Every structure is written in C-alpha cells, then in structure tokens.
Regions:
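Membrane-interface helix caps of multi-pass small-molecule transporters
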Residues: 24, 46-54, 76-77, 117, ...
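Transmembrane alpha-helical segments in multi-pass inner-membrane proteins
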Residues: 160, 171, 175-218
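Membrane-helix/interface signature in polytopic inner-membrane proteins
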Residues: 114-154
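Transmembrane helix-bundle core of multi-pass membrane transporters
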Residues: 55, 59-122, 148-151, 170-181
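Alpha-helical transmembrane segments within multi-pass membrane transporters and channels
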Residues: 29-67, 110, 210-215
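Single transmembrane alpha-helix segments in multi-pass membrane proteins
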Residues: 1-29, 50-57, 191-205
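Hydrophobic core segments of alpha-helical transmembrane domains in multi-pass membrane transport
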Residues: 70-72, 107-117, 153-164, 190-196, ...
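Small-residue-rich segments of transmembrane alpha-helices in multi-pass membrane proteins
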Residues: 20-21, 65-75, 140-142, 216-217
Length: 218
C-alpha cells in the first residue's frame, strides 16, 4: 500500500478487532471464527479503499476515521474486558514449532515470499509501482488506478486481519488495547526503514523484512 503512495492508520485497530473476533466467536467453531475475522478485516479495508479511490477523500482522513470507528467497535464487542480463548487447538497452533522454528515465523516468511512474488511478477504489482511513481502517467497508460488502489486497501485490511488472528492464537486472548496505537507507527517505521518511500513508487517486501529485523534488534 505504501508503494502505492498511501498508508493505512487503521491497521492496528483492525488487528485488535479481528483478534477479538477470533477469540469471541470460537463457540461457533474455529474455522468460522477465523473466516469471519478475516472477512471483517477485508471489509474494513474495502471501505477505506472505496472512500480513497472512488470518493477521492484523503487517505489520512479516511483511515484515521476507520481507526477511531474500529476502536469503538473493539470496546463495544469486548465490553472493555479481556477475552480469553477456550479452544486448546487454537492456542497450541500459535505456540507450535516446526523443526524448532516457530510456526508463526514460518507463516510470516511464506507471506513475505508471496507478497514479493506478487509485487515483482504480476501485473497488479507492476501497476502498484507505476501508480506510486506517477499516478497521472499511470492513468494515461491505461492502468486502472482506482481499482488497483481499492484492491491494495482491501488487501491491507485482510492481511492485518490475518495478523490479528495469528496474534490471538499466540496469546490465546484479546484485550481492548491489543494492536494499537503502537502497531500503526511501528508498521510505518518498519516499511520506511526497509527503504520504501513515503511518497510511493519504490520499495520491496524483502527490504521491509530487513527493516523489521533491524527494528527488532534496536
């Protein structure tokens, strides 16, 4: 999304809200809870994308509004209390290891590889770079600018939701303050530290991983 020239201030609250859904909806079954949580994240991202790409409202205003709105949803859904998971399999997955390596770390690497491939080897990735570099030139070249921006916001919400579900699995709990406000700033700092321009048009997933590890050491 930042390569596209935009950023999303609602990532942290989306992460916290979807973590709460993944814990609170466990009585329906774990797969249903996970699907609803990820769908909610994608839906919030789609709403952000609609107002930014279609309604042409500033992304800062839109995503700040989403941040506040979703934070309210977290308080309403949790009743301002911590939710504790009741499913051992859900928790054991978050704490599991494969050949001594945490499963969640391997999932992160898998998503990084997929994201890197999508950016470098697909038409959508090339469109993302083009729009971030020069949106007017991209429009003149026939690139579907609005659709690309919309999809990137939706993908941002969906991946934040996946992160929320995985975090809930690791902690086996969700609190009203989980995922925000530090997640938003840390996310932007990690991406910028990895070499992505705040104005868009440059950056990569692999360099962002480098920024993540560097920030972790610091």
């Amino acid at each position: 999304l930042m390569i596209n020239g935009y950023f999303d201030l609602s990532v942290g609250t989306v992460m916290g809200f979807t973590a709460a859904l993944a814990i609170g909806l466990q009585p329906l079954s774990i797969p249903v809870a996970i699907i609803i949580a990820i769908a909610a994240g994608a839906g919030i991202g789609a709403i952000n994308g609609f107002f930014v790409a279609k309604a042409k409202i500033n992304a800062f205003v839109v995503t700040l509004g989403s941040f506040i709105g979703v934070r309210g949803l977290i308080y309403i859904y949790t009743g301002e209390n911590a939710l504790v998971g009741q499913n051992y399999e859900f928790y054991s997955f978050g704490a599991s290891r494969i050949l001594g390596v945490p499963t969640l770390f391997l999932i992160m690497l898998a998503f990084a590889l997929i994201g890197n491939f999508a950016l470098r080897r697909t038409a959508h990735g090339r469109r993302t770079y083009a729009i971030g570099g020069n949106v007017e030139a991209a429009e003149n070249a026939g690139i579907p600018v609005d659709r690309t921006i919309f999809l990137n916001f939706m993908l941002c919400g969906m991946t934040a939701a996946i992160g929320g579900v995985l975090l809930a699995s690791r902690l086996n709990a969700a609190t009203p303050g989980l995922g925000w406000p530090d997640t938003n700033l840390m996310t932007i700092a990690t991406v910028v530290l990895g070499g992505t321009s705040l104005t868009g048009g440059s950056g990569s997933v692999t360099r962002t991983l480098g920024g993540l590890f560097t920030l972790g050491v610091l």
